[in-house]
Amino acid sequence: MPDTQELQYTGFEQIPVENLNPLVSRQMIWGERTMLARIVLRKGAVVPEHHHENEQMTYIVEGALRFTMGDGRVITVGAGQVLVIPSNLPHSAVAIEDTLDLDIFTPPRADWIAGTDTYLRR
């Protein structure tokens, strides 16, 4: 993916699938200021607690994720629903069904681009 601003036109079938662990895979595309990630989580997949400077929007295409926020709130997000997570709010998630989600980040996740997101690779 480019490091500079340029026009991109593609489909997810052309974006490589990155298998992060046996239960989670993702595809990513990004521009100068925004990243879109297509994430597949099998039932029981766990995204450990983490936080990031990036604002995050999670849209559940199918399935459901149960998020636990650093302040103790538990929010179940199902198909057709969107969760907006502000910058630096600790959060974790569990796939309570096989789930397809689209995550939007601004700015793009530098750790994902560099492959240094070890919390997801366990």
Residue ranges and their predicted role:
Residues 1-37, 116-122:
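A short, N-terminal "cap"/entry segment at the start of jelly-roll beta-barrel domains
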Residues 71-87:
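Short acidic-glycine-tyrosine-enriched beta hairpin
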Residues 35-51:
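Conserved short histidine dyad/triad with adjacent acidic residue
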Residues 41-42, 52-67:
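Short, conserved beta-strand element in jelly-roll/cupin
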Residues 87-111:
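Ligand-binding loop in jelly-roll beta-barrel domains
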Residues 61-62, 78-79, 97:
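A cytosolic small-molecule/anion-sensing beta-strand core signal
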Residues 35, 57, 64-66, 90, ...:
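Structural motif
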